[in-house]
Amino acid sequence: MTEPVSTELDSRFSASDAKPTSWEDAQRVLSDARIYWITTVRHDLRPHVTPLIGLWIDGSFCFCTGPGEQKAKNIVDNSNCVVLTGCNIYEAGLDIVVEGHAERVVEEARLLTLAEQFLTKYGDEWRFEVRESAFHHEGGEAWVFEVAPDKVLGFVRGDRPGQTRWLFEPRPG
């Protein structure tokens, strides 16, 4: 489980009586979300944003995509990405932004675990077989990626808005 090394409320963007959002609350939003958005960087440095399904598991965000899709092509060139989720209600809610690097998951045991988690969360439409270091289903092959957080931001809206920042240990390499 990835745990933050620091938690900080940014007073510039928070009510004077706001408190930092707990990491547990942030993880709950990430885990319970059904739709996420991912931003990747194209070869020419233009951003690419798209909705997708995914999992928050063991302190990382996991998703799958076809190897020919734009986000997969972008990640091969530049692994930097941002994943976000939340709600679209101005008066209340908690939005979470995860900044990190996407790494391809190829280990069979991990892929089998993730395939089961996708099935549990999203149902039979997202049932995958694992072979050749990827997910497979009638729609074709899907590569699986994992985004371990470098930084996470939480944005609370409502009567006591606040912005919390969580920082994580730099990954080796």
Residue ranges and their predicted role:
Residues M1-P20, L94-G173:
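Charged, gly/pro-rich active-site loop segments
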Residues L9-W37:
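Short, basic/aromatic recognition patches
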Residues W23, G68-E69:
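Structural motif corresponding to alpha-helix initiation and N-cap regions
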Residues A26-Q27, A72, A115:
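Short amphipathic alpha-helical segments and helix-helix/interface helices
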Residues V29-D32, A92, E141:
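A short, polar/charged loop/turn motif at coil->beta-strand junctions and beta-hairpin connectors
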Residues L30-S31, V76-D77, L119:
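Alpha-helix boundary recognition
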Residues A33-P67, K73-I75, C81-C87, L94-V98:
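Short beta-strand segments
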